[in-house]
A protein has these predicted regions:
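His/Asp/Glu-rich mid-to-C-terminal helical/loop segments that flank catalytic regions of hydrolases
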Residues: 86-119
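Catalytic cores of processing enzymes, dominated by hydrolases/peptidases
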Residues: 1-83
């Protein structure tokens, strides 16, 4: 996501403040426990995290996430300025750290037992 994303309906200024936005269609596309787990892991890595604002999840998240059926869809938006120069679209020095952190998150998620994802 762009580093500057304006303000939301709550008049919270997101410019340069939010590193990650987790979109779970307000709890409808992903188990709240799974969203909370991702939020805690990302936050523990030192990033700022918000849920569903300004991005609550797009078409795929809304249409394919069915937590009651064991299908969880969580949109993860990452502030571009953390890993790239937004003017010329080249990697910056933060790319390696983001890659390591997302690898850690992914390994944690794929190691979960299905019952841990119950909606």
């Amino acid at each position: 996501m762009p580093s500057v994303i304006g303000t939301n309906e709550s008049n919270i200024d997101f410019r340069n403040q939010v590193d990650f936005v987790l979109g779970d269609s307000h709890g409808r596309s992903c188990s709240p426990a799974l969203t909370m787990m991702v939020e805690e892991i990302v936050s523990d890595m030192g990033y700022s995290v918000v849920r569903n604002s300004p991005y609550s999840g797009g078409f795929i998240t809304r249409n394919y996430g069915k937590p009651a059926d064991g299908i969880h869809a969580l949109q993860i938006e990452i502030k571009r300025g953390l890993y790239m120069n937004e003017h010329n679209y080249t990697r910056n020095s933060g790319m390696s750290e983001i890659m390591q952190d997302m690898t850690y998150l992914t390994k944690h998620l794929v190691s979960l037992e299905p019952h841990a994802l119950a909606a």
